[in-house]
Amino acid sequence: MLKRSSWLATLLGLLTVASVSTIVYAIELDEATRTVPLESSGRTVVLTPEQVKRGKRLFNNSCAICHNGGITKTNPNVGLDPESLGLATPQRDNIEALVDYMKDPTSYDGAESIAELHPSIKSAEIFPKMRNLTDEDLFTIAGHILLQPKIVSEKWGGGKIYY
């Protein structure tokens, strides 16, 4: 009985400490870091800390299975790094262009639709993880993609040497 009581007291003590302790899981990103390209004309947008968190969560739940670390598992020559996004046709290096891609993806050269092969809103019946994503969700995912090179630099889209 004494062992059980001391075990319960220890457990309650740990739970009490855990409930009153403040644990920081992420770094605070300044406004300059959270500023990403909005459209091809050069306009930018500052992501809120909430959008940053939500974008990361949605990316990890919906995209990371194939794009973990900014790579593309099915085509290691094309990643989500700024250079690859900028060389795509049309360029996919801003939020509006990435949202457009997530709605109706095209090949890297822009010549044909790949909606039946790549998860998208257009092919949500085939790829269920895309079914419930709103335009705001797509916005935050795109923001996450564009923010990562500022946080992890060349690791984002860097491939096997980093992940």
From Swiss-Prot:
What does the UniProt cofactor note say? Binds 1 heme c group covalently per subunit.
Q: What Pfam families does the record point to?
A: Cytochrom_C550 (PF14495)
UniProt xrefs under Gene3D superfamilies: Cytochrome c-like domain (1.10.760.10)
Q: Write out the GO MF terms.
A: electron transfer activity; heme binding; iron ion binding
Residues the entry annotates as binding heme c? C63, C66, H67, H118
- PROSITE patterns registered for this protein in UniProt: CYTC
Keywords assigned by UniProt, alphabetized? Chloroplast, Electron transport, Heme, Iron, Membrane, Metal-binding, Photosynthesis, Photosystem II, Plastid, Signal, Thylakoid, Transport
Q: Which cofactor does it need?
A: heme c
What start and end residues bound the annotated signal peptide? 1-26
Q: How does it sit in the membrane?
A: Peripheral membrane protein
Cellular component GO terms held in the UniProt record = chloroplast thylakoid membrane; photosystem II
| Superkingdom assignment | Eukaryota
Main subcellular location of this protein, as a coarse class: plastid
Name one process (GO BP) from the record. Answer: photosynthesis, light reaction
Compartments, record wording: Plastid, Chloroplast thylakoid membrane
Q: How does it assemble?
A: PSII is composed of 1 copy each of membrane proteins PsbA, PsbB, PsbC, PsbD, PsbE, PsbF, PsbH, PsbI, PsbJ, PsbK, PsbL, PsbM, PsbT, PsbY, PsbZ, Psb30/Ycf12, at least 3 peripheral proteins of the oxygen-evolving complex and a large number of cofactors. It forms dimeric complexes. The extrinsic subunits in red algae are PsbO (OEC33), PsbQ', cytochrome c-550 and PsbU.
Function, as annotated: One of the extrinsic, lumenal subunits of photosystem II (PSII). PSII is a light-driven water plastoquinone oxidoreductase, using light energy to abstract electrons from H(2)O, generating a proton gradient subsequently used for ATP formation. The extrinsic proteins stabilize the structure of photosystem II oxygen-evolving complex (OEC), the ion environment of oxygen evolution and protect the OEC against heat-induced inactivation.
Q: What family does this chain come from, according to its entry?
A: Belongs to the cytochrome c family. PsbV subfamily.
Against NCBIfam families, the record matches this protein to: PS_II_C550 (TIGR03045)
Its recorded name reads: Photosystem II extrinsic protein V
- In the UniProt record, the gene name given for this protein reads psbV
